[in-house]
Protein backbone atom coordinates (compact mmCIF):
# COMPACT_ATOMS: atom_id res chain seq x y z
CA UNK A 1 0.00 0.00 0.00
CA UNK A 2 1.25 3.48 -0.80
CA UNK A 3 0.07 6.62 1.00
CA UNK A 4 0.51 10.14 -0.33
CA UNK A 5 0.15 12.81 2.37
CA UNK A 6 -1.30 16.10 1.19
CA UNK A 7 -0.60 18.05 4.37
CA UNK A 8 2.42 18.84 6.48
CA UNK A 9 2.74 17.39 9.07
CA UNK A 10 0.81 14.11 8.79
CA UNK A 11 0.58 11.12 11.10
CA UNK A 12 -0.49 7.60 10.28
CA UNK A 13 -1.25 4.84 12.78
CA UNK A 14 -0.72 1.28 11.63
CA UNK A 15 -2.24 -1.66 13.51
CA UNK A 16 -1.50 -5.19 12.36
CA UNK A 17 -2.54 -8.63 13.52
CA UNK A 18 -2.92 -12.16 12.23
CA UNK A 19 -6.17 -12.84 10.43
CA UNK A 20 -7.03 -16.14 8.71
CA UNK A 21 -9.64 -14.46 6.48
CA UNK A 22 -8.61 -13.43 2.97
CA UNK A 23 -9.74 -9.94 1.96
CA UNK A 24 -8.51 -6.99 -0.08
CA UNK A 25 -7.23 -3.90 1.73
CA UNK A 26 -9.49 -0.87 1.56
CA UNK A 27 -9.46 2.72 2.69
CA UNK A 28 -12.27 3.78 5.01
CA UNK A 29 -13.54 7.35 4.73
CA UNK A 30 -15.40 9.23 7.50
CA UNK A 31 -18.79 8.26 6.02
CA UNK A 32 -17.75 4.60 6.26
CA UNK A 33 -17.18 4.83 10.01
CA UNK A 34 -19.45 3.16 12.50
CA UNK A 35 -20.06 6.42 14.44
CA UNK A 36 -18.83 9.75 13.20
CA UNK A 37 -19.22 11.30 16.65
CA UNK A 38 -20.85 10.00 19.81
CA UNK A 39 -21.10 12.18 22.92
CA UNK A 40 -20.67 10.03 26.00
CA UNK A 41 -20.98 10.84 29.69
CA UNK A 42 -23.79 13.37 29.25
CA UNK A 43 -26.47 13.26 31.95
CA UNK A 44 -24.43 11.20 34.41
CA UNK A 45 -21.74 12.02 36.99
CA UNK A 46 -22.54 15.74 36.70
CA UNK A 47 -20.83 15.67 33.29
CA UNK A 48 -17.49 14.66 34.81
CA UNK A 49 -17.00 11.90 32.22
CA UNK A 50 -17.99 13.97 29.17
CA UNK A 51 -16.10 12.95 26.01
CA UNK A 52 -16.53 12.53 22.27
CA UNK A 53 -15.99 9.07 20.85
CA UNK A 54 -15.54 8.19 17.21
CA UNK A 55 -15.64 4.48 16.44
CA UNK A 56 -13.96 3.83 13.12
CA UNK A 57 -14.90 0.20 12.62
CA UNK A 58 -15.64 -3.17 14.10
CA UNK A 59 -17.18 -6.32 12.66
CA UNK A 60 -20.56 -4.65 12.10
CA UNK A 61 -19.09 -2.59 9.23
CA UNK A 62 -16.03 -4.75 8.42
CA UNK A 63 -17.04 -8.39 9.00
CA UNK A 64 -13.56 -9.59 8.04
CA UNK A 65 -11.72 -7.55 10.69
CA UNK A 66 -10.12 -8.68 13.94
CA UNK A 67 -9.96 -5.08 15.19
CA UNK A 68 -12.24 -2.63 16.96
CA UNK A 69 -10.66 0.80 16.50
CA UNK A 70 -11.65 4.36 17.34
CA UNK A 71 -10.64 7.53 19.12
CA UNK A 72 -11.70 9.59 22.11
CA UNK A 73 -11.48 13.37 22.49
CA UNK A 74 -11.36 13.72 26.24
CA UNK A 75 -12.43 16.94 27.95
CA UNK A 76 -9.94 18.76 30.24
CA UNK A 77 -10.18 17.79 33.90
CA UNK A 78 -12.63 14.96 33.31
CA UNK A 79 -12.72 11.18 33.34
CA UNK A 80 -12.98 8.83 30.40
CA UNK A 81 -13.96 5.16 30.37
CA UNK A 82 -15.36 5.54 33.87
CA UNK A 83 -16.56 3.51 35.64
CA UNK A 84 -13.50 1.32 35.07
CA UNK A 85 -14.16 -1.61 32.80
CA UNK A 86 -12.46 -4.75 31.61
CA UNK A 87 -12.64 -7.19 28.70
CA UNK A 88 -10.76 -10.31 27.71
CA UNK A 89 -9.21 -8.63 24.67
CA UNK A 90 -5.94 -6.69 24.92
CA UNK A 91 -6.13 -2.97 24.06
CA UNK A 92 -3.71 -0.21 23.06
CA UNK A 93 -4.06 3.53 23.75
CA UNK A 94 -1.97 6.09 21.86
CA UNK A 95 -2.10 9.56 23.48
CA UNK A 96 -1.99 13.17 22.27
CA UNK A 97 -2.46 16.32 24.37
CA UNK A 98 -3.20 19.94 23.61
CA UNK A 99 -1.09 21.75 24.70
CA UNK A 100 1.51 19.02 24.21
CA UNK A 101 2.93 19.26 27.75
CA UNK A 102 -0.34 17.91 29.19
CA UNK A 103 -0.78 14.54 30.79
CA UNK A 104 -3.38 12.16 32.17
CA UNK A 105 -3.51 9.39 34.70
CA UNK A 106 -4.30 5.99 33.28
CA UNK A 107 -5.67 3.31 35.58
CA UNK A 108 -4.20 -0.10 34.86
CA UNK A 109 -5.62 -2.55 37.39
CA UNK A 110 -4.41 -1.44 40.84
CA UNK A 111 -1.79 0.90 39.35
CA UNK A 112 -1.93 4.34 37.74
CA UNK A 113 0.47 5.66 35.12
CA UNK A 114 1.24 9.22 34.11
CA UNK A 115 0.76 9.25 30.34
CA UNK A 116 2.07 12.07 28.15
CA UNK A 117 1.98 13.27 24.55
CA UNK A 118 2.83 10.43 22.11
CA UNK A 119 2.82 7.74 24.83
CA UNK A 120 1.52 4.27 24.09
CA UNK A 121 -0.10 2.16 26.81
CA UNK A 122 -0.99 -1.49 26.36
CA UNK A 123 -3.67 -3.10 28.49
CA UNK A 124 -3.48 -6.85 28.98
CA UNK A 125 -6.56 -9.04 28.96
CA UNK A 126 -8.92 -8.66 31.94
CA UNK A 127 -7.18 -5.59 33.39
CA UNK A 128 -9.47 -2.75 34.52
CA UNK A 129 -8.82 0.64 32.97
CA UNK A 130 -10.06 4.24 33.02
CA UNK A 131 -8.52 7.69 32.39
CA UNK A 132 -8.43 11.03 34.20
CA UNK A 133 -7.19 14.10 32.30
CA UNK A 134 -5.56 17.11 33.94
CA UNK A 135 -7.46 20.43 33.99
CA UNK A 136 -6.59 22.79 31.15
CA UNK A 137 -5.42 20.07 28.77
CA UNK A 138 -7.42 18.32 26.09
CA UNK A 139 -6.59 14.65 25.65
CA UNK A 140 -6.97 12.55 22.54
CA UNK A 141 -6.36 8.85 22.45
CA UNK A 142 -6.56 6.33 19.67
CA UNK A 143 -7.72 2.94 20.92
CA UNK A 144 -7.26 -0.40 19.26
CA UNK A 145 -8.71 -3.68 20.48
CA UNK A 146 -7.65 -7.00 18.96
CA UNK A 147 -10.92 -8.93 18.87
CA UNK A 148 -11.09 -12.63 19.57
CA UNK A 149 -11.65 -14.74 16.48
CA UNK A 150 -15.39 -14.99 15.80
CA UNK A 151 -16.40 -13.72 19.26
CA UNK A 152 -18.05 -10.39 20.16
CA UNK A 153 -16.44 -7.88 22.51
CA UNK A 154 -17.97 -7.91 25.99
CA UNK A 155 -16.99 -5.09 28.35
CA UNK A 156 -17.78 -5.36 32.04
CA UNK A 157 -17.91 -2.42 34.46
CA UNK A 158 -16.33 -2.85 37.88
CA UNK A 159 -19.52 -3.42 39.94
CA UNK A 160 -18.54 -1.29 42.95
CA UNK A 161 -18.34 1.85 40.75
CA UNK A 162 -21.29 1.20 38.46
CA UNK A 163 -23.70 3.26 40.61
CA UNK A 164 -22.22 6.50 39.22
CA UNK A 165 -23.98 5.83 35.89
CA UNK A 166 -27.37 6.33 37.53
CA UNK A 167 -28.68 9.74 36.36
CA UNK A 168 -30.14 10.28 39.86
CA UNK A 169 -26.91 9.42 41.71
CA UNK A 170 -25.99 11.86 44.47
CA UNK A 171 -22.29 12.57 44.90
CA UNK A 172 -22.33 14.72 48.03
CA UNK A 173 -24.35 13.96 51.18
CA UNK A 174 -26.23 17.29 51.17
CA UNK A 175 -26.58 17.68 47.42
CA UNK A 176 -30.06 18.67 46.25
Predicted region positions:
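Conserved metal-binding segment of the jelly-roll/cupin
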Residues: 1-6, 17, 114-136, 142-146
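Short histidine-centered beta-strand/loop micro-motifs
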Residues: 4, 80-87, 106, 113, ...
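Short, structured patches in soluble enzyme cores that scaffold and shape functional sites
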Residues: 5-7, 14-19, 55-59, 71-76, ...
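Double-stranded beta-helix
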Residues: 8-51, 107, 142-176
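Conserved hydrophobic/aromatic beta-strand scaffold that supports enzyme active sites
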Residues: 12-14, 69-73, 92-94, 112, ...
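A short glycine-rich, His/Asp/Glu-containing loop-to-beta-strand
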Residues: 46-92
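Coil-to-beta-strand transition motifs
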Residues: 64-65, 90, 99-103, 137-139
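A short beta-strand-loop-beta hairpin characteristic of the jelly-roll/cupin
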Residues: 93-117
Amino acid sequence: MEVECLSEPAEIAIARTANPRAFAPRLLFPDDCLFRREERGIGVMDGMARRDTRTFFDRSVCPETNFYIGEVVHQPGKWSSFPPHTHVEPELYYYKFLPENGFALAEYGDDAYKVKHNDLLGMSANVTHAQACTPGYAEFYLWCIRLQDDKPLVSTFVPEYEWVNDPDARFFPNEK
